[in-house]
Amino acid sequence: MRGIIWGKNIERARDRFEMLIEDYAWIKIKPIRVIKSRNEFLVEFENGDKWKAIEASERKLGQRSNIALVDIEVDEDIVACIIKPANSMPPYNALSYFSL
């Protein structure tokens, strides 16, 4: 599964990214690769799941995922034009909102 955490800004996306890693730890799934830099947050887990955290903006066209975690503060135009079209990889897809 490929997932994207869409934050209103990179800081909010990063915070939810850290919480996601903790959530996986609760179910005993370990990260095998984690990349954290100024503008990039990627994690790959031992079960094959891959997640990245990015800022939701018009510049993020072309992203693809099965599941999207969207900051509740992201503008609805961005959700409709950027995030929903990006969330279309088969065999399944889901979109969920989060708040910090």
Q: What are the functions of these language-model segments?
A:
Residues 1-100:
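Short, flexible loop motifs at catalytic/binding sites
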